[in-house]
Design a protein with these regions (language model features):
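Metal-centered catalytic cores of metalloenzymes
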Residues: 18-69, 73-135
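Positively charged n-region of N-terminal signal peptides that target proteins for export
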Residues: 1-4
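N-terminal signal peptide c-region/cleavage motif recognized by signal peptidases
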Residues: 14-16
Length: 135
């Protein structure tokens, strides 16, 4: 019994540290998922709960120049609100880190498929290419 309690205590004390590890997500961006059939791209997103930070690299083609980029809440085929603004990949590539609320970070980590990366341009101001986040 004592061994079980000690093991349980060790696991419980390690859980917060494990939960704070950065989580790497990806998305394949396609115009067919939004509105510009010629646009393509990729997104690599690293969520760091310990820093309340979302770091990203966006690479796009066929939509230049991009005017905005965001992470939105929304399942595939569903439009949703912006939860993390990103820098637009105006020359085809953008990378950086943005702060995000702990609740947003926890929700994205818990269910990445309920969030998508959307890149906009002047022709398609509501979104040119889009891709759902996945592990």
């Amino acid at each position: 019994m004592r061994l079980i309690l000690l093991t349980l205590a060790a696991v419980m004390s390690a859980a917060p540290a494990l939960a704070a590890d950065p989580v790497k997500l990806q998305a394949t961006l396609a115009g067919s998922a939004e509105s510009d059939a010629d646009g393509t791209g990729s997104a690599t997103v690293t969520i760091d709960p310990a820093k309340s930070e979302v770091c990203y690299t966006l690479k796009v083609s066929g939509i230049e120049p991009a005017t905005m980029a965001h992470i939105h809440k929304g399942a595939a085929g569903v439009s949703g609100p912006v939860v993390v603004p990103l820098d637009a990949p105006t020359s085809g590539t953008a990378q950086g880190c943005k702060p995000a609320a702990a609740e947003v970070i926890a929700a994205i980590v818990a269910s990445p498929a309920d969030y998508y990366v959307n890149v906009h341009n002047a022709t398609f101001p509501k979104g040119a290419i889009r891709g759902q986040l996945s592990r």
